Design a protein with these regions (language model features):
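N-terminal non-catalytic cap/leader segment that marks the start of a structured domain
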Residues: 1-77, 83, 148
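Glycine-enriched loop-and-adjacent helix/strand subsegments that border the catalytic/binding cleft
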Residues: 51-151
Length: 151
């Protein structure tokens, strides 16, 4: 079964009694896998995974491609972000003191659930563990001088 099959399952990862725990949602409570319940408003969230790498598709919106005056892309290009870029729900975002242009974009993150290499496009869904909302934030002060990076 892949992520597109079966019932929708919303899981959240929290820090509970000093340990990472997976939960499901039941109203205003979160239910741990062992059945214990915690009040959602009182939990500390963790990111939905512990990534080993973060790969981002570059210029995935036509408006961005036009903004950067990039040619039509035959295949997508990508860039990497450090794993320290991952934050959790309700996490703090620190804006550098000298940052004038903080850019943010809503994204959909695909969480890859197992090692994946040379996978045929039609088999991709078998490797995706789920999806999460993501906020791609970047300090754009160096955009003109580092146009190749754009991160």
């Amino acid at each position: 079964m892949n992520v597109l099959e079966g019932e929708r399952l919303e899981q959240r990862r929290i820090l509970h009694e000093g340990r990472p725990e997976w939960t499901t949602v039941d109203g205003e409570e979160l239910v741990l896998m062992d059945g214990r319940r915690v009040v959602e408003a009182e939990v500390n969230y963790l990111p939905p995974c512990n990534p080993t790498k973060i790969l981002c598709i570059h210029l995935n919106f036509e408006s961005r491609r036009i903004e950067f005056r990039a040619p039509d892309l035959v295949t997508p290009t990508y860039f990497q972000k450090p794993i320290t870029a991952v934050n959790a729900h309700r996490g703090m975002l620190n804006r550098p003191d000298n940052c004038q242009y903080l850019n943010y974009e809503g994204e959909v993150a695909a969480i890859i659930g197992r090692p994946m290499k040379n996978v045929a496009p039609e088999d991709t869904w078998n490797y995706i563990a789920g999806f999460a909302p993501a906020n791609d934030v970047g300090a754009q002060d160096f955009r003109e001088t580092d146009a190749g990076g754009m991160t």
